[in-house]
Amino acid sequence: MTVSQLLKQRVRYAPYLSKVRRAEELLPLFKHGQYIGWSGFTGVGAPKVIPTALADHVEKNGLQGQLAFNLFVGASAGPEENRWADLDMILRRAPHQVGKPIARAINDGRIKFFDKHLSMFPQDLTYGYYTRERTDGKILDYAIVEATAIKEDGSIVLGPSVGGSPEFMSAADKLIVEVNTATPSFEGLHDIDMPVLPPHRVPYPYTRVDERSGLDAVPVDPARVVALVESTERDKVGPNTPSDEGSRAIAGHLVEFFENEVRHGRLPANLLPLQSGIGNIANAVIEGLAGASFRNLTVWTEVLQDSFLDLFENGSLEFATATSIRLTEAGFEKFFANWDEYSSKLCLRSQVVSNSPEMIRRLGVIAMNTPVEVDIYAHANSTNVSGSRMLNGLGGSADFLRNAKLSIMHAPSARPSKTDPTGISTIVPMASHVDQTEHDLDVLVTDQGLADLRGLCPRERAREIIRQCAHPDYKPILTDYLDRAEHYAQRSRSMHEPHILQQALRFHTHLAEKGTMKVPSWD
């Protein structure tokens, strides 16, 4: 087939050009039940052409449920995986996902989903943990990877994310590479650590966020590359959720806390490397830092959003490491227009490194993440609404919160239910599901205030969380529960972490029955 000039410019390893194919030619390679790995992380850098061709094939031929795969991605992919979910093309999925169609399929029981710490997932895959039932010795049948260039030695230059691609490519029997010529090449932006199996590992050699190993592309055996496909479609990232009054209040509490930590010598003047999640609260926090007096900041995180570009522009941010650059269309335009400025201050690593407990603890990262709910003793639920309904997955929150120097969670104090504008309290007597334990959390922040939990016993934590973080509609209800629990615990000599198990989940049962967590009485 004819190879475009753009593709020839991007592919500098000539033997690959003879493997260029149209996506439709590759459809016979795919069989029901295969194990597939995709590149991509938080909706960018995922393959587009092959997944779309497969979805078109299934839809056209009525093969829903008859051509389906065990799909592994570093975190969430793009809209293609949601289309696969709608067409019943996913048998099993891990470790993180975003999108109503795929979440609906998981909660309907049509997709077997499991979430896992993002630092552990790719390496556990290379151990063969997720393919134990296979008898052919393979781990993945195919890795489908989006590249933005191919070097002279055949190594693969990834795009705006690294994620689990190095592990997927090393574990796959065969590779299919989508070379995206619609987006500029990201060559020079990556720093790749290839997987090494125990017991032959050595410590990661990084002691600063800007240090690199020097490998800027993923090495592969060219014989395992069965096809190249040209992709001409850019990533589609929707607009960021704007900050609101509540998220700006949270940001204000955090900035004030950081300033106080600096004054008392517990943090340096430029803080420590920052990790921040996705969403309007995360954006508001970054906006708050951009407007504060902190300079020479550094970032060691999973995902960079548009708000980080503002930190670069005003001179506050010195260097950032991530595994994904998740920018809006306008953000990517700004990024490419100022490539020299941004690329010299940025490094993309694999999620195994960006989320590495070793690195997070060594660098003393300040971790900030948003939970579903937190209970009065500081156990946090990040995944399952009312204990059962999966949202997105654990992601990297526990990687960071367990190992950070400062572990912070932020959330609105209350959220609306269908019938009550403050019908769901973020602070509950007992979390309906626990992802992060009371031992992992240092600071909790809501729009109401900030609770510093360091060094407090459980009963002290409970009083501080209710006083500082609970919504006014829930403070008396939570205080009444805690008073009763302490009275009950005194009689049973169990005062360390008082609970009344018959009542501890009443917020959740009352929400299910009445549409609000505002229980009228504990009697």
Curated annotation (Swiss-Prot):
> Which residues are CoA-binding?
G277, I278, G279, N280, I281, N392, G396
Question: What does the record give as the reaction this protein catalyses?
Answer: acetyl-CoA + H2O = acetate + CoA + H(+)
The compartments listed are:
Cytoplasm
Active site, renumbered: E302
Cite a single GO BP annotation.
acetate metabolic process
Q: What class of enzyme is it?
A: hydrolase
Organism's domain of life?
Eukaryota
One example GO MF annotation = acetate CoA-transferase activity
Instruction: Show the InterPro entries listed in the entry.
Output: AcetylCoA_hyd_C (IPR026888), AcetylCoA_hyd_C_sf (IPR038460), ActCoA_hydro (IPR046433), ActCoA_hydro_N (IPR003702), NagB/RpiA_transferase-like (IPR037171)
User: What is any one of the record's Gene Ontology cellular component terms?
Assistant: cytosol
**UniProt keyword annotations, A-Z:** Cytoplasm, Hydrolase
What's its EC?
Answer: 3.1.2.1
What's the family? Belongs to the acetyl-CoA hydrolase/transferase family.
Function per UniProt: Presumably involved in regulating the intracellular acetyl-CoA pool for fatty acid and cholesterol synthesis and fatty acid oxidation.
- Name under which the protein is recorded: Acetyl-CoA hydrolase
Can you name the source organism? Eremothecium gossypii (strain ATCC 10895 / CBS 109.51 / FGSC 9923 / NRRL Y-1056) (Yeast)
